[in-house]
């Protein structure tokens, strides 16, 4: 679980306007923060298959949001993946 201060910082740094909490950019950034926080857990606990299912669900949801953003506005998509360091 992400600390509320970290979550607020992620929202603030990726928001398109002052009160923006639901744009695809913010949602992808929050999912990325949660995924990055869970990744070390699975390095230590390789047999946690129930938790891994939740992680894969988050990755899938992030992928769908990125696909949506790419189809709607490719410039915002490329800026977001560069900012989050998702693709090479």
UniProtKB/Swiss-Prot annotation:
Stretches with biased composition (Polar residues): 14-23
Complexes and interactors: Part of the 30S ribosomal subunit. Forms a bridge to the 50S subunit in the 70S ribosome, contacting the 23S rRNA.
InterPro entries (alphabetical): Ribosomal_uS15, Ribosomal_uS15_bac-type, uS15_NS1_RNA-bd_sf
Cited function: One of the primary rRNA binding proteins, it binds directly to 16S rRNA where it helps nucleate assembly of the platform of the 30S subunit by binding and bridging several RNA helices of the 16S rRNA.
Organism: Delftia acidovorans (strain DSM 14801 / SPH-1)
Ribosomal protein as UniProt keyword: yes
Domain of life from the UniProt record: Bacteria
Family: Belongs to the universal ribosomal protein uS15 family.
A GO molecular-function annotation: rRNA binding
Any one GO CC term of the record: cytosolic small ribosomal subunit
UniProt entry keywords in alphabetical sequence: Ribonucleoprotein, Ribosomal protein, RNA-binding, rRNA-binding
Name this protein carries in UniProt: Small ribosomal subunit protein uS15
NCBIfam families recorded: S15_bact
Gene Ontology biological process terms, A to Z: translation
Region (Disordered), start-end ranges: 1-23
One protein family per Pfam: Ribosomal_S15
UniProt cross-references to SMART domains, sorted A to Z: Ribosomal_S15 (SM01387)
């Amino acid at each position: 679980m992400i600390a509320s201060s970290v979550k607020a910082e992620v929202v603030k740094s990726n928001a398109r306007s002052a009160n923006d909490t639901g744009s695809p950019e913010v949602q992808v950034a929050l999912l990325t923060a949660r995924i990055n926080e869970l990744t070390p857990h699975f390095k230590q606990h390789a047999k946690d298959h129930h938790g891994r299912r939740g992680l894969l669900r988050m990755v899938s949801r992030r992928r769908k949001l990125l696909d949506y953003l790419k189809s709607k506005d490719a410039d915002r998509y490329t800026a977001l993946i560069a900012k989050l360091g998702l693709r090479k």
